[in-house]
Amino acid sequence: MPLLLDICPRIWYNTAMQTDMEGLWRTVTAGETGEKFAAFYAMLTEANSRFNLTRITGEEECRVKHFLDSLAGMNYFPPNADCCEVGSGAGFPSVPLLIARGDLAFTLIESSQKKCRFLETVIKELGLRASVVCARAEEAAKGPLRERFDVCCARAVARLNTLAE
């Protein structure tokens, strides 16, 4: 009898990935972290009703496309890493990573004043180890932030070659 992997590797891979991510979700939402994810979702949807943070607002879609997507690489961050997120927007992937990995610290770089205020509120309310720099990445990179971080990340900000500059 052929294995599912032999017949359709993509279906097998997607099913295995989904199973792994569901397990991850159950693990990271136990106890206090689950409450923080719920609070972040509530803050996100409330703020999104006033100004555009994201088009993804449904609970299940947000869980999969924002939270789980943000957490997919969390085990690649070294312990106690000092991290930077360029173009933080609504806080993905930084906020889910900060909730799930309390050992991480983030500097969030965002150019929109409204989004910076939202991120500052989230950080304060959830007690996260993060700070917000309200500036364009090109400008922030010229100052004391340059080459300071263990890990830098970005999501849906720019083409990779532009971002790497």
Predicted segments, located by residue:
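Class I SAM-dependent transferase core
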Residues: I7, W12, M17-N80, K114-R117, ...
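Short coil/turn segments at secondary-structure boundaries
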Residues: G58-E61, C84, T107-E110
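Conserved class I S-adenosyl-L-methionine
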Residues: N80-G89
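Conserved SAM-binding loop of SAM-dependent methyltransferases across substrates and taxa
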Residues: A90-D103
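S-adenosylmethionine
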Residues: D103-E165
